[in-house]
Every structure is written in C-alpha cells, then in structure tokens.
Design a protein with these regions (language model features):
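Non-heme Fe(II)/2-oxoglutarate
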Residues: 326-376
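Catalytic core of non-heme Fe(II) oxygenases with the double-stranded beta-helix
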Residues: 216-222, 244-313, 351-359
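Non-heme Fe(II)-dependent double-stranded beta-helix
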Residues: 120-144, 152-251, 374
C-alpha cells in the first residue's frame, strides 16, 4: 500500500525550495510503517519522495494507524513520541523536528513559518482596542495578527467576584483530582497552576463563559464556533506560580494544536479573561504576531532569525483573543507571579465528531506533568 499522500495543491514551489535548503544538513528521513517504507529527501528546489526506499539519515518506525494520524494532522510527532507510538532507529527527535514543518506543508498545505514572509498589512501588533471598535475592525486585527488585546471588557467588581470564586475552587483542589494541574516548586512543594472544567463547578464562572461580551469576541472570525465546557478541559483558569518550577506552569513556545488535532481543532479561538493584570513580573503572554495558520520548528529560536515577538501586558478586566495555532508562550514570571487568566475557547463543530468528554490529550496526561514537562 502506498504511504506517501498526494502533495497538497496549495504548495508554493518557492516556499518549498527555501524549506528544502534548510534541510540540507539534516538529510533524508525514512518512515518504516509496518512492512512499507517511504523516504523524503531534500532535493533543492523541491523534496523528493521515494516509496520503498529506506536509506534516510534518520529512520522512524511507527504503525500504520500512527502514520495515518500524522499525515492527516490528527496527532503530531511530539504526541506520537510522548505516547511511545514512534521509535527512532537512526537519528532522533531533533531531525524529526527539522522535517516536521515541511511534512505538514507537503501533507496538508500548512506552510512553514518564515519571518521574511510576515506581512502585517500596515497594522500595529501592539495595538489595544476597546469594545467601542466595530466588529470589522476587531476581526481585521485578529485575522492579520492572530491575536487581539481588548481593554476594560469587564469591571473591577466583576473580576473581584470571579477571583473569589477561583479562590474557592483553588481551596478545594488536590493533586491527582483530575480537575487541576500542579507543579513542584524550588522548595519541593506542590503548587496549583491550573484549574480545568471550572464552569461545570461554578455558576459564577459559567456566567462569564456565556457572557455576550465573550461570545462577541470569540465569534469574530467564524460565527459557527461553539463552546465546549465538558471537553478539551473546558474553561480553565491559569495561575502563575513564581520562581523555578517543575511542570507546566511556565509553558514554552507552542501552538495549541502542538500535540495534535489541527485538522479538527483549528482555527479555534481562545478568549483570555484577565482576572488579574499581567506583565513580565507576574507572568504575561508572549506571541509571534502573524504566525497562525503556519507550521513552525519546535525549537524555532535556535534556527530562525528576525522573528517578531510581542509581549501582551494587561490590566484586570482586559481580554486577550488568540487563534489557537498562533505561536505563543507563557514564560516564567520575573517577579512575584500571581497572574490569573480564565481561558474560554470556541471550537469548530468538527470537534464533537472526534473528541468526547475526557478524551483530549490533556485529559490523558494531566497527572503525568513531569513527562510532558521534559519537552521544555
């Protein structure tokens, strides 16, 4: 049975040539899938695909089901690696990471991110808006940048009530309760860093989730998107823990579909309700403007130059909006930490065809944070 899927019709020869040149030092990669083999070779100005050939500098073995998931953008190679559903017979993780953006382009037409192609259409990545702006202006900024900062969406009183409810849920949380994420502090203590499925346990937070202001912003790009309070961790609250921690309080550069599901999750839109303000000292959001809808190297900081980065500092009651495949990070606070953000996400209807309650990747690894954290 043939392994190599047809090349996506959206492939631009110039983009593929530039990507192939970057793979020169990495060399060819072979996939052994049950009894079949396929090898991808950087052959500037393109990539050569050879069925039955197994002489790549990197050799990856996986099952047919895993290969199909990779090609169809249901699971990423990182997901397969963590799940031990792929093994390296030659080469390793770094070589697979080098090939990953190119394979996504060939298989699904998702172009490799290149800062030289960044086009902000004259817009300012640092712009802040209010709800007085019309939907067309807000949508245009979100479409170009992949993120949006809207000030003073909620009042201080509304945020005080929400924070009191977060205090209540935090007091009830325990490691291993399957409704929270925890990290280990420098002193060896466990510290709460995320509450999940919060609106199933709080009418106060459920009201925020369903607030017309949240819906307006979440549906700017696609009015058919839907809330998913009972799956994908529902609406979650991030709590930034200060200092060096082991676990997933400080999340490195990533796309929210980085573990898989791009074909069914994207373009989801995530609303960040700023329960507290955020800045570098408390732990803020960093983004690569205009990186959404593209594939980026897992360690892009080591292999790409000139990548624009924006820090999104906020006040209590502000809202951030980001397309889920935007490249973004939640770095370690430089000071006291303490940022609280409630994330409410709107998904395409295809989600309900594939992922039920408790079936998302995070549901499966929530209590295995040390394993996931080794990718930082």
């Amino acid at each position: 049975m043939a392994l190599s899927p047809p090349v996506a019709p959206e492939v631009d020869p110039a983009i593929l040539e530039r990507a192939a040149r970057r793979l020169h030092s990495t060399g060819a990669i072979t996939f052994l899938v049950d009894g079949d083999a396929v090898t991808y070779t950087p052959a500037v100005p393109s990539v050569q695909v050879d069925e039955g050939k197994a002489d790549g500098a990197t050799v990856v073995r996986m099952s047919r089901a895993s290969w199909d998931d990779l090609v169809r953008q249901f699971r990423t190679f990182i997901n397969l690696f963590l799940s031990e559903d792929l093994a390296f017979e030659r080469g390793g993780f770094r070589q697979m990471a080098d090939w990953d953006p190119v394979l996504k382009y060939l298989h699904a037409g998702i172009p490799p991110y290149d800062p030289e192609r960044a086009d902000f259409a004259g817009r300012d990545p640092s712009a802040t808006f209010t709800l007085d702006a019309d939907d067309a202006e807000l949508a245009a900024q979100l479409e170009v940048m992949g993120f949006l900062h809207v000030a003073s969406v909620f009042t201080p009183d509304e945020m005080a009530v929400a924070n009191a409810e977060v205090d209540r849920l935090a007091a009830e949380a325990r490691p291993g309760d399957d409704r929270s994420w925890w990290v280990t502090t420098e002193g060896g203590d466990s510290a709460l860093c995320r509450l999940v499925y919060t609106t199933l346990r709080s009418s106060v937070l459920a009201a925020l989730e369903d607030d017309p202001r949240v819906r307006r912003l979440g549906l700017l790009l696609d009015r058919s998107l839907r809330l998913a309070p009972d799956r994908m961790e529902g609406s979650a609250v991030l709590l930034k823990v200060p200092g060096n921690t082991s676990g997933l309080s400080n999340i490195p550069w990533h796309q929210d579909c980085g573990m898989g599901g791009h074909a069914i999750l994207c373009p989801s839109v995530s609303i960040g309700i700023q329960l507290t303000g955020s800045e570098a000292a408390t732990g803020n959001l960093l983004v690569v403007p205009g990186s959404h809808g593209q594939a980026i190297h897992y360690r892009w900081e080591e292999c790409l130059e000139g990548v624009p980065v924006a820090a999104v500092d906020t006040a209590p009651g502000d809202v951030t909006v980001h397309v889920q495949d935007l490249v973004h990070a939640s770095p370690r606070p430089t000071g006291a930490g303490g940022r609280r953000t409630m994330y409410v996400t709107f998904y395409p209807s295809t989600l309900w065809e594939h992922i039920g309650p408790g079936q998302a990747f995070n549901d499966l690894v929530r209590n295995r944070t040390e394993q996931v954290a080794r990718l930082q």
